[in-house]
Amino acid sequence: PSILSADFCNLERDLKAIANADLVHVDVMDHHFVPNLTLGEPIVGRICQVTDLPVDVHLMIEDPDRWAPEYAKLGAASISFHMGATHAPVRLARQLREMGCKACFAVRPAEPVEPIFDILDEFDMVLIMTVEPGFGGQKFLNNQMAKVRRLRDEITRRGLKTRIQVDGGVSPKTAHIVAEAGADVLVAGSAVYGAENPAQAIDDIRTKAEAAFKA
């Protein structure tokens, strides 16, 4: 789940509430690359220390070439960055992988996915945004599923192991749509932390996605 929808004054409590999840998704925003400001290295470092879950960091910041390795040093298991922000995406991806961190590429709704096909084998995962980046709780953009399908077809055609992550508007109502399109990593924020029982919401999303995988 995305902690963007968690209570930042009770973050350790809210991390424990999602102990049944597969990962913790942390959105780092600098108020320059996107119009919001969230958290930075000190808090991400503490999150890595207090949770047993893999920490998946999404950098919505300028100059990830400089900052991404710092988050890898803090213990991030995977780091996503944007093409429009990096000067050398392949070099950065290789650097992160050499540090034992998975390299991930993030694609915003208005951006096509095809330009990254040539360097797809350099990345462990591609993050397809299904809301405009910057704020949680937005409406799911169903038109992005065509992008997910094209990406899945390319990954399958080339026999790659690159995973597809979808973030934005994911809920028990949309999980099957995302999974059917070909995504295998689902990030939910408000659907989890806005639920009366976050752990149950995670199970519901997982069940819906797994059913779609098997269909």
Q: Residue spans of the language-model regions?
A:
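Conserved N-terminal beta1-alpha1 strand-loop-helix module at the mouth
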Residues: 1-80, 85-88, 103, 116-123, ...
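Anion (oxyanion) recognition and catalysis
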Residues: 97
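Acidic, divalent-metal-coordinating active-site segment for phosphoryl/phosphodiester hydrolysis
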Residues: 169-181
